[in-house]
């Protein structure tokens, strides 16, 4: 299997650090608002990569963080007259609902930056002790000029970075490109005690600390959008390798292309968002997956209603194949399942070529439909069809869940328990209730007014 490594700029044979195991970290959202389909694109792609690695026999440990303290979260919370933590938790709930609705496998852990401050302070202190960072005015900065190979991920020198960036003049810094590991407190902002006074973590150090805590000093795959290559991921490498002394921090860097609306990237700052909730009100989760997977994960993707309508039609064709009932009167007909499986794995082994893998599933669907039209059936072909569809995360469910109303009191009790756990900041247990209910076909939806549940379709 070969994957494209942003660090080397070429396809490389995939050999994990430890035989049979894969440690995978994917940058999560900053929960300042509802998730949009740009997020769906990213997490669908990494979900499929994770599913395929699992299919190949690897034991994948998958971590995805929440940057739940940030300048934008603080500004939005202040504008709404609520605590930043309240805003972040509300949007985290909406995000997890959206991921469940998209049939995205839950992460093994969803660490929150605000819950990892002790580890962050430990890393910042260690970087100061080693001479890579300095404290001034209650803030702490990393000395990028001391970092060996700084710029190796984005393939740029410090001079090129300076020329291509709007560098704010800050008299505190020793060098303009030095970046904050710890920010001194400001009036009205959340803050934590530290050796440098009250303050809060810088963005980049949060992911370094969380990946170190949950995955160790080295990881196999680090994923994220191409807009995170610089400065975020470049700075993660600098911090992590300087702190641990172990190289490489990440063996394979994978970056997905960005979703566009017309000629512009879809983003909060541009205000051209289509939320996942809006998209799912018009199209099925399978249609969104087909839309995303019809292109390489590294390519940009342009959102259009026409493309999604075509994806929905494709999803419906696949659903009809998946829903086919066995007819004992039909003659068993051979399908070359080995050839289909080999095609599928050959494509996926080539940097997760989901477009060609998806085409293989459609070809198999057409053959199964042709066989049925000739009063035949293929038990093995039907089984392989569902297996390959599952690797791409396609549920292809036609019928509604038959969950009855008699379970309502039990579900309401679990919702109350989850609420109490969140108040007690037992977020991992609260998330486990959500994901367990999702597995059982119950979707939770959080809002300012509370939590409601519904049966997934």
UniProtKB/Swiss-Prot annotation:
Motif ('KMSKS' region): 265-269
'HIGH' region, short sequence motif: residues: 29-39
UniProt-annotated binding residues for ATP: 268
Enzyme class, first EC level, given as a word: ligase
Molecular functions (GO terms): ATP binding; cysteine-tRNA ligase activity; zinc ion binding
Biological processes, Gene Ontology terms: cysteinyl-tRNA aminoacylation
Cellular component terms per the entry's GO annotation: cytosol
Catalytic reaction annotation: tRNA(Cys) + L-cysteine + ATP = L-cysteinyl-tRNA(Cys) + AMP + diphosphate
The protein's required cofactors: Zn(2+)
EC number from the UniProt entry: 6.1.1.16
Main location: cytoplasm
Keyword Ligase annotated: yes
SMART domains: DALR_2
PANTHER family linked: CYSTEINE--TRNA LIGASE, CYTOPLASMIC (PTHR10890:SF3), CYSTEINYL-TRNA SYNTHETASE (PTHR10890)
Subunit structure: Monomer.
HAMAP family, A to Z: Cys_tRNA_synth
Protein name: Cysteine--tRNA ligase
Species of the source: Dehalococcoides mccartyi (strain CBDB1)
Gene that encodes it: cysS
